[in-house]
Regions:
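Ankyrin repeat boundary/linker residues
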Residues: 95, 128-130, 136, 178
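Boundary at the C-terminal end of the N-terminal hydrophobic targeting segment
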Residues: 22-26
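Ankyrin-repeat inter-repeat connecting loop/turn
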Residues: 89-92, 124, 174
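Ankyrin repeat (ANK) core detector
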Residues: 47-55, 61, 65, 100-103, ...
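Ankyrin repeat A-helix N-terminal signature
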Residues: 104-110, 137-140, 145-160
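Ankyrin repeat structural motif
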Residues: 75-85, 110-119, 152-168
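Bacterial N-terminal signal peptides
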Residues: 8-17
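Bacterial N-terminal signal peptides that target proteins for export
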Residues: 1-9
Length: 184
């Protein structure tokens, strides 16, 4: 399995593409050196968790062939997009499943940076794609991720409150349903 893991890493990193929003003018944010370092550190944790997930999930690969590799590939795309965001500050980047830098900064507990991103024009109603039983359904918005508990690294509900306020102030729709029709 370890040999297969290395193969999956090589295959996955070779085919990752990050596409900006179609027909949108570029929106960027000037990241401070401290923010760039914060993103780099969080992104390294994300990659570490990904490799740990892969190592620990070999029984799942046996029971559900291909699903672990698909999940790994998705997380690797997030890692690469976040690195591209760190280098360019482009707020409109997205992975093929429509996860944005704002989604990831929220998920990684980078709340102050996420507030700055919202204020700089990051798409507050961007909705990822949720794969369920082979179908594509509307996924979560940044507001949903900001309201969820247990998704974040080093982030309490109290620390996320200014982010929730910023998202709502800048037009996040609190009634936009995600998977199974759940709203934030």
């Amino acid at each position: 399995m370890r040999q297969m893991t290395g193969t999956m890493l090589l295959l996955s990193s070779a085919v990752v593409m990050v596409a900006p929003w179609a027909h949108a003018e570029e929106k960027t944010i000037q990241l401070t050196e401290a923010e760039q370092q914060e993103i780099k550190t969080a992104n390294e944790k994300l990659l570490g968790l990904t490799l740990r997930f892969l190592h620990d999930s070999w029984p799942l690969e046996i029971m559900f062939p291909g699903e672990v590799q698909e999940e790994f590939h998705s997380i690797l795309q997030c890692h690469q997009m976040l690195e591209q965001f760190r280098q360019t500050g482009n707020l409109l980047l997205q992975t093929p499943d429509r996860t944005t830098p704002l989604h990831l900064c929220i998920a990684l507990g980078l709340n102050r940076l996420a507030v700055r991103m919202v204020e700089a024009g990051a798409p507050v109603n961007a909705q990822s794609i949720f794969m369920h039983d082979g179908t594509k359904e509307p996924g979560d918005t940044p507001l949903t991720w900001a309201c969820l508990s247990g998704l974040y690294m080093n982030s309490t509900a109290e620390e996320r409150l200014p982010l929730v306020h910023a998202l709502l102030k800048h037009g996040a729709d609190p009634d936009q349903p995600g998977p199974w029709g759940v709203t934030p």
